[in-house]
Regions:
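Interdomain/boundary linker segments immediately adjacent to catalytic/signaling cores
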Residues: 1-79
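Well-ordered, non-membrane alpha-helical segments in soluble/globular domains
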Residues: 31-44, 135-156, 187-208
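Acidic-residue sensor for enzyme active/binding pockets
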Residues: 65, 87, 120
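A short acidic/basic microdomain associated with nuclease active sites
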Residues: 76-102, 107-111
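Conserved catalytic cores of phosphodiester-cleaving nucleases, focusing on short active-site segments
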Residues: 108-129
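Short, charged, solvent-exposed linker or helix-capping segments at domain edges/interfaces
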Residues: 120, 130-132, 252-256
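Catalytic cores of nucleic-acid endonucleases
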Residues: 123-189
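Glycine-rich, aromatic-bearing surface loops/beta-hairpins
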Residues: 161-256
Length: 256
């Protein structure tokens, strides 16, 4: 895949390095906007968990994938139109021809800028001090996420809300970390090299993922503030968000 170009966005003490979009497709621009705003809100809410005076350092990106939900759900709620539903059945269409879904549920359902979004989320940790590609965890989970979104494509046509279409969106949060305490110089090297690191990861996902449509369409990193980088004997310099937005699916007319 072609490498992304990046630029820095800063707001309210939050610094994000994000890929730049150049698309004439409305759905892609809307997907980019929700991702961009989501990562800012993710960072804002994560920073609220940093309370040194109360000895509270329960930063969600330090833990497992399920802990991310405690930040992603309210972040989506803050930026989307109306309610964000979690663990939503893929098929909700009421029809004379009852269709039984074998695909289960999607992690999130929401409406943003006139589009329905069905979202799958994964989370991984990646040691930024290692040169090896993240074959087992990151690539395997990315491939599973793309597979799940491919499986619900036909079901998305049957969603009954009156929107411009349904955008399937895959979110993969990658927490950069090391079980070592590095110097500030090494953290700065991470920040300076994050563009290259993101492109290497995205290229690996596009190349190694055997599932159709596996190439990422968005990549960004939240550069964690200096005061939050170190925790006990570990270093957390950033949280990456790598995402895939599929072309919007138009609703089928009701057959009722």
């Amino acid at each position: 895949m072609d490498p992304f170009s990046f630029r820095t966005f800063s707001k309210d003490g939050i610094e994000i390095r994000s890929s730049i979009i150049d698309s004439k497709d409305e759905y892609m621009n809307v997907a980019y906007e929700i991702l961009h705003r989501l990562l800012f809100q993710f960072a804002k809410l994560s920073m609220k968990a940093y309370r040194p005076r109360k000895n509270a350092y329960n930063l969600p990106y330090m833990y497992s994938e399920r802990r991310l939900d405690s930040v992603v759900t309210p972040a989506l709620s803050d930026i989307c139109d109306g309610l964000v539903l979690t663990e939503m059945p893929a098929v909700r269409k009421k029809s004379k021809k009852r269709i039984k879904s074998k695909h289960g549920r999607v992690d999130y359902w929401c409406i943003f800028k006139g589009y329905t979004f069905v979202i799958e989320m994964k989370g991984s940790h990646d040691r930024f001090d290692c040169e090896t590609v993240r074959e087992y965890s990151l690539i395997r989970r990315w491939g599973k996420m793309i597979e799940q979104l491919n499986e619900v494509a036909e079901d998305c046509e049957l969603m009954e809300e009156k929107t411009k279409g349904v955008i399937r969106l895959g979110l993969h949060f990658v927490s950069s970390w090391s079980p070592k305490v590095f110097s500030n110089k090494r953290v700065e090297e991470y920040r300076e090299g994050c563009d290259c690191d993101l492109n290497v990861i995205c290229d690996s996902l596009a190349t190694c993922c055997n599932t159709a449509g596996g190439a990422p369409t968005y990549a960004a990193v939240w550069l964690i503030p200096d005061k939050m980088v170190y925790w006990k004997d570990a270093t957390y310099p950033g949280v990456m968000l790598i995402a895939k937005a599929f072309e919007d699916i138009k609703h089928k007319p009701s057959d009722e």
